[in-house]
UniProtKB/Swiss-Prot annotation:
It comes from Aquifex aeolicus (strain VF5). It comes from the Bacteria. This is Uncharacterized protein aq_1356. Residues 1-24 are annotated as: Disordered. Residues 12-24 have a biased composition (Basic and acidic residues).
Length: 144
């Protein structure tokens, strides 16, 4: 018969203390800049699909010149006569779109789940994602 041997590891393993992140919420001016960046960069990334960017509803944070943004993107597709709405997670650095992932897309340049994990040291990514899902639900119900 086997015997269980326990090795002493001292006291309970130290729990990671959540460090306070030095982020600021995005302002209306920041979102206007996000829309301009999307208009320019999404047409470059998806030239056969994106005709125009109509607007963004979302939330996000900034840390220095970096922004982590989640939300709903209203846009025009070349093949559709009506506007489309897509959920997204994006990272902007300065006035350039660094990464974007669409939750509904099958093929993305970047995985949104990985982006949430990667940037959680700088931003409150999990809270922002909860906000995105709440925002999406309210949009689908017609509340916004």
């Amino acid at each position: 018969m086997g015997k269980v041997i326990q090795f002493p590891f001292g006291e309970e393993p130290e729990k990671k203390e959540e460090k306070e992140l030095k982020t600021e919420p995005l302002t209306e001016e920041d979102f206007n800049q996000v829309i301009e960046v999307f208009k320019k960069d999404l047409k470059t990334l998806y030239p056969s699909q994106v005709k125009d960017i109509l607007g963004v509803i979302g939330l996000g944070e900034k840390y220095g010149d970096e922004k982590f943004v989640v939300g709903l993107l209203m846009w025009e597709h070349y093949k559709h006569s009506h506007p489309l709405v897509s959920s997204f997670v994006a990272v902007l650095k300065g006035d350039k779109l660094e990464k974007i992932s669409f939750l509904e897309a099958k093929n993305n340049y970047w995985d949104w789940k990985l982006m949430v994990k990667t940037y959680k040291d700088k931003f409150h990514t999990e809270e922002l994602m909860r906000g995105l899902f709440e925002l999406k639900e309210r949009f689908e119900k017609g509340e916004i």
